[in-house]
Amino acid sequence: PADYEWSDRDHRVVYMFDAHNLFDRTTSTYNKEWRVDEFMEGLSAAGVYEPAIVVGIDAPQNRYDRFAMYSIGEWEYRRRPDTRRLHRIHGFGDETAAFLMRTVKRYVEKTYRASRDRERIAVAGSSMGGYMALYVGARFQQQVSKVMAFSPVLMDFPMRGYVLRDEIVRAGVSQPQRIYADMGDREVLDFCGPRELQDHLEEVRLTLEQAGHSQVRTRLAAGDRHDERAWARRFPGAYLWAFDGVEAD
């Protein structure tokens, strides 16, 4: 935040996956960025809502390595329905989550004026990073009170989305959380189209409610595709809802 150097207060923290796409398009995969830093600077300048320290978690550029980092257990990925070539993914998302909460978070809190109050801590991500945000939120409720999952990929095939749903049910609700999840209505992936993505988002919403979560917000964004520009447009509203209870489309 802009006042970090001259203030002595602790700051909100958002831990976000895919750091290379968050702040600068020159480091991004597709020359698109979330503009998270510009948003936080705008909050500082306006002085109405509190900005946050944003901690970006880097990810491998290779898509299969990224799939492994952001999923649980073994599964097979076929890029196109008409190809027989399969990539076996050995997911270690449970280790990713533990590293984030037990190593990165502790380092950040020791090194910076980052709040340790769970009410001031969020985790966020998009696509498979959205899957991981939901997983971290379920598993580490004592440390995280806000979850933001943008266009989360939650398919049972190929990436075993039912494992995430099972974890949400198993974890239940030990602490209240505000959970935001969304999807664009024009999103298409190699292995599925808009309807399948939306159906699985709805399935996770129902699972969250079944588990006992009462502060869940899902959104279907008209015209949005599966990319950083869409997530950049939706991030401000999600952040303000999660931290400040601001209701906006």
Where are the model-predicted features located?
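Non-catalytic cap/lid and distal C-terminal segments of serine-dependent acyl enzymes
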Residues: 1-249
